[in-house]
Curated annotation (Swiss-Prot):
It comes from the Bacteria. One of its GO terms (biological process) is nitrogen fixation. The keyword Protease does not apply. Belongs to the NifW family. Homotrimer; associates with NifD. May protect the nitrogenase Fe-Mo protein from oxidative damage. This is Nitrogenase-stabilizing/protective protein NifW. The keyword Repeat does not apply. Keywords: Nitrogen fixation.
């Protein structure tokens, strides 16, 4: 597992600190979430999409104080990461492509093609 990062200094604006994060590992380290690098390497896009989905479901939390938002953001990131520790991308079906059951076909009569 990666070493847990020290809790960030929240004296400054949380939003400014978040703007500096560019990778799944950056987010996990910033929020002090211990992680297995191989899990993140395989599932980074899925983890971040699930995290985004959880943030959207959480509703309007932007008005909360930074320390409270930090705790909420961390909790949701832990949840998103853990979804992929015990499961896999195909099972979790984060992206639309995993929701497609069968190839979609459409019949177009030849007379419609000719005008």
């Amino acid at each position: 597992m990666s070493e847990q990062a020290a809790e960030p200094n929240l004296d400054g604006p949380l939003d400014e600190a978040l703007e500096e994060l560019v990778s799944a590992e950056d987010f996990l380290n910033f929020f002090g979430v211990p992680f297995v690098p191989s899990v993140v390497q395989v599932n980074r896009l899925h983890i971040m999409q699930r995290y985004h989905d959880y943030l959207c479901q959480a509703g309007d939390i932007e008005h909360l104080q930074d320390a409270v938002r930090y705790a909420v953001y961390r909790k949701l990131l832990v949840r998103a990461y853990e979804d992929f520790v015990a499961s896999d991308a195909q099972t979790e079906k984060v992206f639309k492509v995993f929701h497609m059951h069968e190839p979609q076909t459409t019949f177009v009569p030849i007379d419609q093609l000719l005008g």
